[in-house]
Amino acid sequence: MAPRQLRLGRNHTEGALAGTRITLGAQPVLIGRADDSTLVLTDDYASTRHARLSQRGAEWYVEDLGSTNGTYLDRAKVTTAVRVPMGTPVRIGKTVIELRP
């Protein structure tokens, strides 16, 4: 089953975004502190343009966009675009997101 939602983990994310759910479409999801990001983070450890989630077929991939503090899939630092299994935590600064059905 392909993921349909991007969820910000309630137990892992600080601030007003905890528990937020975003419905995924075909367009990439730009994540960062920039006002024009798809997901705008109020996380001092996130870069202005931190990471991007994009769909390739039925799979979703995350790539770091040259952030200062890195993007992590589970506990591994993302250095190239990497597939994101459903339910696997992606950490951007202090923010943790997961793909959900």
Regions found by a protein language model. Name each.
Residues Y45-T48:
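Short coil-to-beta-strand transition motifs
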Residues M1-T42, S54, R91, V96-E98:
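Intrinsically disordered, low-complexity acidic Ser/Thr-rich regulatory segments
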Residues I31, Y72-P101:
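C-terminal boundary/linker segments immediately following FHA domains
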Residues V62-T71:
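Short, basic/aromatic beta-hairpin or loop at an interaction surface
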Residues Q55-G57, G66:
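A generic beta-sheet turn/junction motif
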